[in-house]
Amino acid sequence: CRVGNDYYMTASSFGCLPGLPILHSVDLVNWEIIGYAVERLEPAEQFDLASHGNGIWAPAIRYHNGEFYIYWGDPDNGIYMVKTKDPAGRWEKPILVHKSKGIIDTCPFWDEDGRAWIGHGFAGSRAGLKSVLAMIEMTPDGTKTIGEDRIIYDGHEDNVTIEGVKLYKRDGYYYILCPAGGVPTGYQLAMRSKDIYGPYEWKIVMAQGKTD
């Protein structure tokens, strides 16, 4: 995320601790690790043991009302959030925002009216479905979900393995930037709608190249 002339980024850390590395840059080329957002994962009884490939999947960092937020999907436990006013300092303990199984690739979004949302994908290994995107409304402070989890796009016909939601709004349109097609043959999509729940039109904005 961008705050003034500073850029911040984080990444999946799965079960490794400290987790959620915080990277800072002023030019989007040179990056420095300035800290970590998570010292301990919950539930402790699960992560006190080796837990390969579990834990923090595909986090999203955002800045809202003077605070930095990171949300991530733990495919076995649900959606978690940590926040801070100083990204290089100490982050608050993780909050379980939404208890569930199979949710991954979460991204928060705050609208102009103060309402908050969390978009996400699904891990087929846990949820029993994938290739769809969904949206849940949150309380304005982003600490818990309210209402139902609604599928906003089904990619089975045109964009299988769609995942990795990143949410934005510009000129009255809600935008989702996300990958689809799987790792070996994947591509990047831009989707947009006048309604956060859709329907969404989409366009491939970056595709696989060829090496001769």
Regions found by a protein language model. Give the residues of each.
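Carbohydrate-active catalytic/glycan-binding domains of CAZyme proteins
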Residues: 1-212
